[in-house]
């Protein structure tokens, strides 16, 4: 990933249906959304792909990215409750919103070893492999279908997974990935 096109930050959310009707106030400060502007939150959950901030500074703009995500969440729920989704969601209520964003990237620190896709796919053995993982490399990009209304700051992503990872075997992450090669006494994780 380059500085333009970083992966973003997610703010997940959840909703439920109550036994009786639940009101929801208009949210003029939220993003102006209708049901077609976002994927329907199946299973009462807005998952990881409610993500924005791709071309923003993940540290300097962290609060702005989070605020945009929250405006998207509340705008989507407003569409469900007060706009074209209102008939179907009379009993729906917002039950949880992650007010702390989950960033995918921040500083790009380098250890003595940089684990590559080739290392993972070829099951390269490292003598200091200390953390097992079975997750493939995935990159997140704005989903074009939902980026039309806010092309400069889309808030729905999709993931592209790299070459297959043998999930039964996984791969060991070397200890040398976790400390900085040029900043003394700095240990990294994430």
Language model regions located:
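Flavin (FAD/FMN)-binding glycine-rich loop and adjacent Rossmann-like elements that form
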Residues: 1-189
């Amino acid at each position: 990933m380059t500085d333009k096109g970083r992966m973003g930050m997610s703010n997940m959310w959840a909703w439920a249906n109550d036994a009786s009707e639940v009101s929801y106030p208009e949210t003029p400060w939220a993003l102006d959304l209708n049901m077609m502007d976002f994927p329907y939150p199946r299973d009462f959950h807005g998952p990881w792909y409610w993500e924005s901030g791709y071309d923003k500074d993940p540290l300097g703009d962290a609060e702005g990215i989070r605020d945009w995500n929250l405006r998207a969440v509340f705008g989507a729920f407003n569409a469900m409750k007060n706009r074209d989704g209102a008939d179907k969601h009379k009993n729906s209520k917002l039950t949880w919103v992650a007010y702390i964003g989950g960033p995918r990237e921040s500083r790009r620190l380098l250890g003595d070893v940089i684990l590559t896709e080739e290392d993972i796919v070829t099951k390269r053995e490292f003598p200091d492999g200390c953390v097992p993982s079975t997750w493939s490399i995935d990159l997140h990009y704005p989903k074009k279908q939902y980026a039309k209304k806010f092309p400069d700051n889309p808030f729905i992503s999709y993931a592209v997974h790299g070459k297959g990872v043998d999930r039964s075997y996984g791969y060991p992450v070397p200890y040398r990935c976790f400390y900085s090669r040029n900043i003394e006494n700095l240990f990294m994780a994430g």
